């Protein structure tokens, strides 16, 4: 049996870039372009890893009960605020987990590039 190959974040290993903007109903400020470079998705479609870049702007986020994210900022600066207004800032070298059920505001203060791992458990019957 052959072991699965390691997944690196080398530029030539990325999938096709996905360009989007926050939904209008969620926007707080700006209309930033977001670019997601996927590097890995598991066979069940529950676990994704990649690189994400974004222009300055802010939008509301609401993670479902089964969705969570780990990220590590490579460059730029972001701020995440909870509904009570408590804010945390992250810059190069900082990392964070956004837990399942989190709601708040995600703000890109300076153009940002981060690595991310997203896990979203699929509903079971």
Region annotations inferred by a language model:
Residues 48-65, 99-100:
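Conserved short histidine dyad/triad with adjacent acidic residue
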Residues 51, 87-89, 103-105:
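Well-ordered beta-strand positions in beta-sheet-rich domains
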Residues 92, 100-123:
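Ligand-binding loop in jelly-roll beta-barrel domains
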Residues 44-47, 55-59, 77, 122:
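Short, charged/polar surface micro-motifs in flexible loops or helix N-caps
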Residues 84-100:
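Short acidic-glycine-tyrosine-enriched beta hairpin
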Residues 1-46:
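A short, N-terminal "cap"/entry segment at the start of jelly-roll beta-barrel domains
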Residues 61, 80, 114-116:
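Short hydrophobic/aromatic-rich beta-strand segments that constitute the beta-sheet cores
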Residues 64-80:
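Short, conserved beta-strand element in jelly-roll/cupin
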């Amino acid at each position: 049996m052959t072991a699965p190959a390691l997944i690196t974040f080398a530029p030539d290993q990325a999938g096709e870039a996905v360009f989007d903007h926050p939904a209008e109903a969620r926007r707080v400020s700006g209309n930033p372009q977001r670019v997601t470079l996927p590097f890995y998705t598991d066979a069940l479609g529950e676990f994704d890893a990649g690189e994400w870049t974004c222009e300055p702007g802010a939008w509301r986020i609401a993670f479902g009960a089964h969705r969570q994210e780990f990220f590590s900022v490579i460059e730029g600066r972001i701020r995440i605020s909870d509904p009570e207004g408590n804010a945390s800032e992250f810059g190069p070298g900082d990392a964070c987990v956004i837990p399942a059920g989190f709601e708040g505001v995600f703000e890109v203060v300076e153009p940002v590039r981060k690595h991310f791992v997203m896990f979203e458990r699929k509903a079971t019957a």
